[in-house]
Amino acid sequence: MRIAFDINGTIRDTFLKAEQLYQKFYIDEYEEDNVSVYDEEKDDFISQENDESFEYGLDLPVKSLDHLENHFKFKDKDDLFNFFYVDFPMQIFGHAPSVEVSTFNELNEIYEELRDNHEIIIVSDEIGKSKPATLFFLSKYGCLVEKIKFYSNITIDSMWDEIDILITSNPNHVLNQPQNKTVIKCTTSYNEDVKSEFTIKNVGEFKELYKKLNLE
């Protein structure tokens, strides 16, 4: 049996780090006359006069992955994309905390207990520089899982082809579960209203659910 853990929301608290960075660079600094703006050519932040025509703001917790612009307010979707994947990918995806202090201890224990009978996989929806940032995140916390697969909206079918059970916080995966696949929802603010046959609150709870599923 191939058991996969999805990173965002299940293992990594991505939006907490994004909130901290947004607060610092788009709210706190925009209260001043000059703000810091990332310059790709110089690979550094430069001082720029404040544009008061747009009001930045946060609306949290995140309730929808499909409408992040409602929670992290930018002038357009390109600016939202750049925030996550161009300007701050290492800070957001690499330096984000784990969902709980014990998350990686629990994950590594699951890996060590099940690896002889099952293939344990880490999967994650990543774009561009968020991939190396995610590898840094996993190494930072001492993740022992050997197989890591990145996917996107274009390659998601290949992700499903390589797994049998998915532990995820992504509501789209719960709602679009393929036949003959098992999806276990890990509860977050943005999937509370999505029904799932199997639900856990954190990675550690998978241990008890595994026994009930009788996968030996």
Task: Provide a role label for each language-model segment.
Residues 1-75:
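Active-site neighborhood of HAD-like aspartate-dependent phosphohydrolases
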Residues 74, 78-121, 129-132:
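Short, acidic loop-to-helix structural element flanking the phosphoryl-transfer center
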Residues 122-124, 184:
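Short internal beta-strands
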Residues 125-179:
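Substrate-recognition "cap/lid" segment bordering the active-site pocket of phosphatases
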Residues 148-152, 198-208:
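Short acidic-hydrophobic, aromatic-tinged amphipathic segments that line or gate anion-handling sites
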Residues 157-160, 206-216:
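Short amphipathic alpha-helix with an adjacent loop that forms part of the alpha/beta core around
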Residues 165-203:
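Acidic, Mg2+-coordinating phosphoryl-transfer loop and its flanking beta/alpha structural elements
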